[in-house]
Design a protein with these regions (language model features):
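Short, solvent-exposed, charged loop/turn and helix-capping segments
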Residues: 71-92, 137-140
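Generic structural concept
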Residues: 36, 40-43, 47-50, 68-71, ...
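Surface-exposed patches in mature extracellular/periplasmic domains of secreted proteins
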Residues: 63-64, 84-86, 115-118
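Sec-dependent signal peptide recognition
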Residues: 2-10
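A charged, solvent-exposed segment within the mature domains of Sec-exported extracytoplasmic proteins
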Residues: 112-141
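Short helix-adjacent coil turns
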Residues: 62, 103-114
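N-terminal signal peptide c-region/cleavage motif recognized by signal peptidases
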Residues: 14-17
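Immediate post-signal-peptide N-terminus of mature secreted/exported proteins
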Residues: 20-65, 137-141
Length: 141
């Protein structure tokens, strides 16, 4: 009877450990990045970091770490846009920021397939966003 109780307790504890969802994950601040100071700076960072992400193919442990570090700069760039744009462009920046946070968490926790899926979503959204910031006069400020 004591073995049964111990076994059931162990099972319940292990289920509890596995029941945590991704929505409860909180990122760990590993890197402090300065806020963006201009549209030109935010644009440059966004385009360069997107290019760096696009170069990642293997998504091994090293690349996942690099992706994780890239997300810090992307988060700052998107925060600048979310604060300084309006309308559709602002909404798109906010939507992309949510995906970047998902990439951040997945790469930080070495989840290769989740990271790949979130990156795919990111690249779809970022194409429209890059086109909008490239064609706007915002980058001249």
């Amino acid at each position: 009877m004591q073995k049964l109780t111990l076994t059931l307790t162990a099972c319940l504890l292990s289920l509890n450990a596995f029941s945590a969802t991704d929505t409860t994950e909180k990122p760990v601040q590993h890197l402090i990045v300065e806020n963006m100071g201009s549209f030109l700076e935010a644009k440059t960072v966004f385009i360069e970091m997107t290019s760096d992400l696009n170069a990642k193919e293997v998504l091994d442990k090293n690349e996942l770490h690099e992706i994780h570090m890239i997300t810090y700069s992307l988060e700052k760039s998107l925060a600048f846009y979310a604060e300084n744009l309006s309308g559709t462009a602002q909404k798109l920046a906010e939507d992309i920021a949510v995906v970047v946070e998902e990439i951040h968490l997945a790469s930080e926790n070495n989840r290769q397939e989740s990271t790949r899926e979130f990156l795919s979503n990111y690249f779809e959204l970022s194409q429209d966003f890059i086109a909008s910031i490239e064609s706007s006069d915002l980058n001249k400020h």
